[in-house]
Amino acid sequence: MTDEALLTQVLMPYKDHCKYLRSAVVTETDGRASARCEFEIPESCYIDDTGHLNSVEVNICYNQMMYYLVAKSVKEGLGTGFESWTLEDFWKHQLPDILIARFSSNFRRPVNPRVFSGEMEFRSVTRRAPAGGSPFVHADTAFRYWDADAGRCDGEATLAFVNVP
């Protein structure tokens, strides 16, 4: 079940017409958290209607899904590498310190942006401390989107959480 108060706070940094994530259910399997989400994009925030989900929207949806998954994992103490974090830590680090180091997406069939589903999972989350550098959390993730008409998109992203508590 979606934590509505948490979702509202996670989406606070977004302009109203860019809040695409409508619901999210977070689960944990074998110590890894994942989220299954529902999205709606009534109108693109930057371009005339293309009739399909595009790469900019895929990235925005990924960000919203990822922020919710991390916040929920922190709040519920899920084993995703954020056990020492508090929600205050998350709010402090949400925008300046959670970086997408690598992002790739594959469009298999056009996805209807008006109503579609998505999911993401943490494949690995590790704390790293490079010699002479500041510690950070490295996370490999996978995601996918689909719609009722067999539209499909999937991809992978690598995250770096810097200035970690």
UniProtKB/Swiss-Prot annotation:
InterPro entries the UniProt entry points to: FcoT_ThioEstase, FcoT_ThioEstase_Rv0098-like_sf
Segments passing through the bilayer: none
Gene3D superfamilies: Rv0098, thioesterase-like hot dog domain (3.10.129.30)
GO molecular function, one term: lyase activity
Reaction(s) this enzyme catalyzes, per UniProt: a (3R)-3-[(carboxymethyl)amino]fatty acid + holo-[ACP] + H(+) = a (2E)-enoyl-[ACP] + glycine + H2O; (3R)-3-[(carboxymethyl)amino]butanoate + holo-[ACP] + H(+) = (2E)-butenoyl-[ACP] + glycine + H2O
Pfam family, one: FcoT
Top-level taxon in the UniProt lineage: Bacteria
Keywords in alphabetical order: Fatty acid metabolism, Lipid metabolism, Lyase
Family the UniProt entry places it in: Belongs to the FcoT family.
Purpose: Involved in the biosynthesis of a unique class of isonitrile lipopeptides (INLPs). Catalyzes a Michael addition of glycine to the beta-position of an alpha,beta-unsaturated fatty acyl-[ACP], producing a (3R)-3-[(carboxymethyl)amino]fatty acid. Acts on the (2E)-butenoyl moiety loaded on the acyl-carrier protein ScoB, forming the product (3R)-3-[(carboxymethyl)amino]butanoate released from ScoB.
Protein name per its UniProtKB record: (2E)-enoyl-[ACP] glycyltransferase
Name of the gene encoding the protein in the UniProt record: scoD
